[in-house]
């Protein structure tokens, strides 16, 4: 447990170390903006009772940081009286990514993504059942309804491997308000 706490603190400090006022000022100056490059990733999330996919799009403001927008489709599985119910949602969040490159060629990199936004429940499947006694439709006790807005938070640390030119593989754990599991994705 101490190792997990130490790892979380180390990654949070890694993200915070990139937020010095001078480095932000340099990245957003006229000269710094000339070096901005687009960065897009597509990733899938798989957890114990959740799954989905996300697309991120942003700008790499320097060699170590990316800022952008993350949108995704999430499915959470709830255990209900008659089996399982799927709650579908759509999320949008602002995210920041911090890289720690290994070696001069930057083939391998550790990264940490932090995202904060909102998720809207778009529908439910399996939450409704027909009462065999009187034939009425019942809804199981799930505390969400279609149209509900929920806070969305995600932390995805991991390893990035560059394959060819600017094509990368992303792999690591996912700790979010909608998924506890792993993620795998590609970026360019």
Regions found by a protein language model. Name each.
Residues 41, 79-85, 140-145:
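Extracellular loop and loop/strand-boundary signature of outer-membrane beta-barrel proteins
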Residues 45-47, 101, 174-176:
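Short polar/acidic secondary-structure junctions
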Residues 21-73, 97, 183-187:
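Short glycine/proline- and aromatic-enriched beta-strand/turn motifs that initiate or cap beta-hairpins
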Residues 56-136, 156, 161-167, 188:
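Gram-negative (and chloroplast) outer-membrane scaffold detector with strong preference
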Residues 27, 32, 131-138:
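Surface-exposed loop/turn segments flanking beta-strands in extracellular/periplasmic regions
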Residues 34-38, 49-53, 86-92, 108, ...:
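Residues that define the transmembrane beta-barrel architecture of outer-membrane proteins
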Residues 1-35:
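Cleavable N-terminal export/targeting peptides
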Residues 146-150, 154-188:
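Gram-negative outer-membrane beta-barrel domains
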């Amino acid at each position: 447990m101490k190792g997990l706490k130490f790892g979380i603190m180390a990654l949070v400090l890694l993200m915070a170390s990139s937020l010095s006022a001078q480095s932000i000022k340099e990245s957003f100056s006229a000269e710094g903006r000339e070096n901005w490059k687009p960065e897009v990733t597509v990733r899938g999330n798989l957890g114990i009772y959740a799954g989905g996919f996300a697309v991120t799009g942003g700008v790499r403001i320097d060699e170590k940081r990316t800022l952008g927008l993350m949108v995704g489709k999430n499915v959470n599985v709830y255990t209900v009286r008659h089996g399982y119910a799927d709650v579908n949602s759509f999320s949008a969040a602002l995210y920041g990514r911090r890289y720690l490159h290994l070696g001069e060629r930057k083939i391998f990199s550790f990264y940490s993504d932090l995202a904060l936004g909102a998720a809207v429940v778009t529908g439910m499947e399996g939450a409704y059942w027909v009462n065999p006694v009187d034939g009425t439709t019942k809804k199981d006790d799930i505390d969400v309804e279609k149209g509900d807005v929920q806070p969305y938070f995600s932390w995805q640390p991991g390893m990035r491997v560059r394959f060819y030119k600017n094509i990368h593989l992303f792999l690591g754990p996912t700790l979010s308000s909608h998924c506890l599991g792993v993620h795998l994705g590609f970026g360019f």
